[in-house]
A protein has these predicted regions:
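Small-residue-rich segments of transmembrane alpha-helices in multi-pass membrane proteins
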Residues: 20-28, 144-161, 208-209, 286-301
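Intramembrane alpha-helical segments
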Residues: 2-11, 76-166
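Extended hydrophobic alpha-helices typical of membrane-associated regions
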Residues: 3-4, 254-344
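Hydrophobic core segments of alpha-helical transmembrane domains in multi-pass membrane proteins
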Residues: 45-47, 107, 114-125, 170-180, ...
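Acidic (Asp/Glu-rich) catalytic motifs at the cytosolic membrane interface
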Residues: 49-80, 85-87, 181-213
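Multi-pass membrane catalytic core of lipid/isoprenoid biosynthesis enzymes
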Residues: 70-120, 204-254, 297
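Transmembrane alpha-helical segments that form the membrane-embedded catalytic/substrate-channel core
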Residues: 51-60, 123-133, 151-152, 176-195, ...
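Membrane-embedded alpha-helical segments that form the functional core of polytopic membrane enzymes
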Residues: 21-64, 99-104, 113-127, 166-189
Length: 344
């Protein structure tokens, strides 16, 4: 296997989403430790297993989307010809086999049944999102599977170091609920991207005299207007939880203020732009919604880092985490609809 194929495989594992998704479980690990020293062997095995599962889920999506990505994701290495589909299939099977073996080893070594159950559910939904016969991304359940897979990341990180989910006033359950709702909304946002690309490519059409709000969302089976309202309800609803959790003493003032000051304005601005002109502003509101989601998980990372290093170093590490995402996107998607400057 040559270097070109290895690089193509790495790109097909969508490293930018693995990178930024890792912030969720790293932050949870640090907060769950609460100043204690972890079992380094258990933690190391957990890290390798989690990264393998995350990568396998992303790779499965790249592989199963290779035909439709000629329109929706032309920088997919299975579309550009950098990666042969036969090699990709073998590697996908091998990667998931390794993930299963690692998960089994984690079970035998830690005997942490709650952790393994959470990781199994996350792995299942990560694969079921795109892999037939379920391929939930083409159903009404798509945003749910997208959201549950992401929301379980911090719970898994917590459970490797803290057996109780209600420790620290149930913080991790509360944060996972917030992340689930916003991830659900982001999942719908991604359906809008696909719908507008299909409209632009002539795969779907608006009836004469109708508007974009009346067309069906591709892969979601709801009208654009209905999906838009559901996106608003879940995305903005996530932030309604923050003052409640703050009042109940579940969230600290620092975390609450950070969540209200950074992700909330971006989410609100995205909603406003989409309502004004969903076609013209599509790339802007997609970018804002994505950045809002990223800020949520990076704030969790920052909160965790602040328990082991000074606030200044925690902020610096968060800045590196944020900068890493667009850098990796630029490498994986140098052009096309999924790039930073893509049409949608």
């Amino acid at each position: 296997m040559n270097i070109r194929t290895l690089v193509a495989l790495w790109k097909a594992n969508v490293p930018h989403w693995v990178w930024i998704g890792s912030a969720a479980w790293i932050g949870a690990v640090l907060l769950g430790l609460d100043g204690r020293t972890p079992d380094w062997g258990h933690l190391a095995l957990f890290i390798v297993t989690t990264l393998t599962i995350q990568s396998a889920a992303e790779f499965a999506n790249s592989f199963t989307d290779r035909k439709e990505d000629r329109i929706y994701g032309p920088t997919n290495t299975l579309v550009t010809g950098e990666l042969d589909a036969r090699i990709a299939k073998k590697m996908l099977i091998a990667q998931n086999t390794v993930a299963a073996l690692l998960l089994l080893a984690l079970l035998l070594i830690t005997l942490n049944y709650a952790l393994i159950a959470v990781m199994l559910v996350g792995w299942f939904f990560g694969l079921a999102y795109s892999v037939p016969p379920l391929r939930l991304k083409e159903t009404l359940h798509g945003p749910f599977s997208h959201a549950i897979a992401f929301a379980l990341l911090p719970i898994a990180g917590w459970l490797i170091v803290e057996p109780s989910l209600i420790a620290q006033n149930g913080f991790i359950i509360a944060f996972a609920a917030l992340l689930f709702l916003h991830s659900f909304g982001l999942g719908i946002t991604l359906k809008f991207r696909k719908t507008l690309l299909a409209l632009d490519s002539g795969l779907i059409h608006m009836e004469q005299g109708s508007s974009v709000y009346s067309i069906g969302t591709v892969g979601f089976r709801l009208s654009f207007k209905t999906a838009m309202h559901l996106e608003e309800l879940t995305s903005l609803g996530a932030f309604i939880l923050i003052p409640i959790f703050w009042y109940l003493g579940v969230f600290t003032a620092a975390i609450s203020i950070a969540l209200l000051a950074l992700p909330l304005p971006l989410t609100a601005a995205a909603m406003i732009l989409r309502m004004k002109d969903p076609i013209k502003n599509s790339s802007k509101y997609k970018a804002m919604m994505t950045l809002s989601w990223i800020f949520i998980v990076v704030i969790l990372l920052g909160a965790g880092l602040a328990t082991v290093v000074s606030p200044g170093y925690a902020v610096l590490a968060c800045a590196v985490s944020l900068a890493g995402f667009p850098l990796l996107v630029r490498i994986v998607h140098p052009w096309g609809s999924k790039s930073l400057n893509g049409r949608y």
